[in-house]
Structures are given as structure tokens and as C-alpha cells.
Design a protein with these regions (language model features):
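N-terminal beta-alpha lobe that positions the nucleotide/phosphoryl donor
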Residues: 1-183, 187-197
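Single conserved hydrophobic/aromatic residue that forms the stacking wall/gate
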Residues: 198-208
Length: 208
């Protein structure tokens, strides 16, 4: 989506694109750009790397160490996401994976024994409204569509919840989001991590 919108902008058609800009969508969707954004805003993320070929994937896994969470970049709804714990599982995943410079794989440190939160919010560029903070019953890494959630969260401290609200607001305002967005956080030992961000015209079409 962000590539298509950027192409329209380059054509110079004087189109008025309502909502989140292509630039903001790309910053949310591109791994390196979002990591740079998170560092500027002092938001913690799991260690992660990007790879465009098999050798790069294996180097990334070796550097990060098992278990890892691996997934394609720029996909809908977390398709192709797997938690890998050993070389045999990695070999099986790579047998099915398609990699290229414009279709990289994202390899992240898997935070075991972590609690996952799904946060839905909307931003108009000036204010952020948080619609729901959902706590996953399953441990972090299970796709949202396969998980069970509690609203409101049952096992999260007030301090962490306050930080979730603060980070959600920071992301919406600093990225310049105008519309809906979804953030997936992980909590381990009272430490908060940003794991995924979805933002576009539909709130679940792009991910970082």
C-alpha cells in the first residue's frame, strides 16, 4: 500500500490523500526506519534483524540466538509468522520462504514467558484516543486471530499500563498517524517492548 501511494505522489497528480500519509505508513512499515523511530522516541523493541537471502537469515538467527520470531515484511495480518527453536525448524521454514530485496524476512528475538497486549487506537494528528487494551491469554507470539483476549487487562500493573498508554500516544503523534492503528506490545519482568505496529487506511494492513 505505501509503495502504491508513494508512486501516486511521484506522478504529481495533485491528489489529496486523506488520512495517514504514505511517508508515515512507510516509516511504520519499514523495519530499519521504525527501529530508528523507536530509538529516537526511547521505545524498547526486541532485538531484530532483516534478511533478503538464506545466508542473511541464518546469520541473523545465529546472531540473535534461538528462539526467534520470523515473519515476512509488508504482509497482511501476520501471515507466515513462526516461532523457531532450532535449526531443523529453520530449515523447514526456509524451504517454503520466498526472499528478495523487496520481500525481506524479519527475524526477532522471541520473548519467552512474556505477556502480549493488543492496543487499538485512533489519532487525528493532535490527540490520541485509545479504544481498547487487550491482554492475550496465550503467551506472546500467538497470532491475534488465534488468541483469546481479556478486556480490561487482568494481570498488568498500573505502572505498565500507564507506560502502554504513554507509548501508544507517542507513536500516534510522533508518526503523524491520522486514523486507526494497532500496536502489539510484549511485557516480560515488568519491562515493556513494542513488537508490531499496524497503520494504514485499514488499521491492519501494514506492519513494522
Amino acid at each position: 500500500l505505501s509503495d502504491n501511494l508513494s508512486h501516486l505522489e511521484k506522478l504529481g497528480l495533485n491528489l489529496v490523500i486523506e488520512g495517514t500519509t504514505p511517508e508515515a505508513v512507510d516509516e511504520a512499515s519499514d523495519r530499519q526506519r521504525f527501529e530508528d523511530f523507536a530509538e529516537r522516541c526511547q521505545l524498547d523493541m526486541p532485538r531484530g534483524m532483516t534478511a533478503i537471502d538464506s545466508e542473511g537469515v541464518r546469520k541473523a538467527v545465529s546472531s540473535i540466538g534461538y528462539p526467534v520470531l520470523i515473519r515476512p515484511s509488508y504482509v497482511l495480518g501476520g501471515r507466515g509468522m513462526e516461532i523457531l527453536s532450532n535449526d531443523k525448524q529453520l530449515d523447514a521454514y526456509m524451504d517454503e520462504a520466498f526472499l528478495s530485496p523487496d520481500r525481506p524476512l524479519l527475524i526477532d528475538e522471541y520473548l519467552g514467558n512474556a505477556i502480549e497486549l493488543d492496543v487499538d487506537a485512533v489519532c487525528d494528528g493532535e490527540e490520541v484516543l485509545i479504544g481498547a487494551i487487550m491482554e492475550h491469554l496465550e503467551e506472546a507470539g500467538i497470532h491475534s486471530g488465534d488468541s483469546t483476549c481479556f478486556i480490561p487487562p487482568q494481570n498488568i500493573s498500573e505502572g505498565v499500563l500507564s507506560k502502554v498508554e504513554e507509548w501508544t500516544t507517542t507513536i500516534g503523534l510522533e508518526l503523524g498517524i491520522r486514523g486507526c492503528y494497532n500496536i502489539q506490545f510484549a511485557i516480560r519482568d515488568e519491562e515493556l517492548y513494542v513488537c508490531l505496529l499496524y497503520t494504514s487506511y485499514a488499521a491492519d494492513e501494514e506492519d513494522s
